[in-house]
C-alpha cells in the first residue's frame, strides 16, 4: 500500500492543493524519519481528478546502539546466553585434537573448546528504507448515467537487511596450509566453526516496484448497474 495515502483516497472529490512535510529524530540512539506528501484535486461539471504523491525515508537504527538489547548474551541481565559457537577467531584441529584459538577472549571461550561470537550488535533494529508512492484518480462523465474512470497507483520501495558475518560450520572445508607462514605446526590445519569477520557483516539491498492500473465505465445500462 502507498504509505499515508489511505486518507487521501477518501478525498476523491477534493478541490485544491495540500502539502505536508515532517521530520523527527533522536541522537541517542541515532535515528531519524522524514515524511512528505502532496494532495491535489480539481473538479468540474463533467470531470474530476485527484493526485497524491507520498514520500517516506528513515535511517538505520543498528542493534549496536540498543544497549543491553543489542547483545545475544543476556545472562548479565538474568536471561540466556545465545552467543553463537560459530565464532571469531574460532577453533581448529591439530592432529585431530580440537584446539581453541589462543586469541579467543577469555569470556568467549567455553569448556568444550568453542569460541563464542556475539552476533547481536550486527543486526538492524530498524533498517534504512525509502518509499515513494503515487495515486491518481480520474473521472469523466460521458453521459447522463455513465462515467469513465481510471485509477493509477505506483510504488517504489528500497530497504536493506543485514546480520553478522556468515557463520561457517566444520563442513565448510576451511584449512590453513602447512606451508602458510603463520602456521607453526608444519601441517594442514582444519578450521572448525568460524566466522569470516574480516569480510564484513552481511548486507542485502531490497528493491521493489508496484504498478496498479484500473480503468472502466461506471453507470446504468438497461436497468443494470
Predicted regions and their residues:
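Surface-exposed beta-strand-turn/loop segments characteristic
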Residues: 1-215, 221
